[in-house]
């Protein structure tokens, strides 16, 4: 993708500095009085970041905001697979699991579609490799590259990732949800989501 290149000698994605757009299209729409839905994602781990990106891709006019408690998003993603980011496993079979009824496990494992997430990562520009045990890793074997790629695409889709936010309450009403949280600075804020 734009902003990243694969470097065979270092096996890393490198971010190129590119000037940001001076005008966010979402800001222009809001100024024009166009109401856009708000989507809040609570948690900036691997699933939260992927959900935020998928939401931004599916609803380009939506304002997508991620609230993360930690100072940086993707903390556990960086540790998965011993820092290599084990994305998937193609070698899943009932006999590999301890269960009293392996036959009951078969339909569940058959329902797992490993191709879709890998296709999604590939569309983002992530090359992968599969080891002899069927574990799928980024080609660079660096979890930090997966996080950098997600952060790059989140920025391109104008997704806000707010860190140091501790959610205090989540209330549902007819008009949506209200999330009250404390910022890293200790102030209380409320955001609404549709």
Over which residues does each language-model region extend?
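N-terminal amphipathic/hydrophobic targeting modules at extreme N-termini
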Residues: 11-13, 20-21, 25-28
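Core beta-strand elements of the Rossmann-like FAD/NAD(P) dinucleotide-binding domain
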Residues: 186-194
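Short beta-strand to alpha-helix junction loop
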Residues: 106-113, 133-152
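Glycine-rich active-site loop/strand segments that organize a redox cofactor
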Residues: 82-130
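A conserved short coil-to-beta-strand element within the FAD-binding core of flavoproteins
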Residues: 163-176
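Beta1/beta-strand and adjacent pyrophosphate-binding region of the FAD-binding site
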Residues: 36-47
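Glycine-rich FAD pyrophosphate-binding loop
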Residues: 56-79
């Amino acid at each position: 993708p734009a902003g990243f290149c694969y470097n065979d000698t270092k096996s890393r994605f490198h971010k190129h500095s590119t000037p940001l757009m001076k005008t966010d299209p979402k800001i222009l729409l809001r100024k024009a009085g166009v109401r856009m839905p708000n989507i809040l994602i609570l948690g900036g781990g691997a699933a939260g970041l992927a959900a935020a990106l998928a939401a931004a891709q599916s609803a380009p006019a939506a304002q997508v905001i991620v609230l993360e408690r930690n100072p940086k998003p993707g903390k556990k993603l960086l540790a998965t697979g011993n820092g290599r980011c084990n994305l998937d496993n193609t070698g899943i079979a009932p006999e590999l699991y301890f269960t009293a009824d392996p036959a009951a496990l078969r339909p569940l494992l058959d329902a797992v579609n490993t191709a879709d997430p890998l296709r999604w990562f590939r569309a983002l520009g992530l090359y992968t490799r599969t080891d002899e045990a069927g574990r799928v890793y980024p080609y660079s074997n660096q979890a930090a590259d997966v996080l950098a790629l997600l952060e790059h695409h989140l920025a391109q889709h104008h997704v806000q990732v707010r860190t140091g936010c501790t959610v205090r309450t989540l209330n549902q009403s007819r008009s949506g949800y209200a999330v009250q949280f404390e910022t890293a600075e200790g102030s209380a804020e409320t955001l609404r989501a549709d």
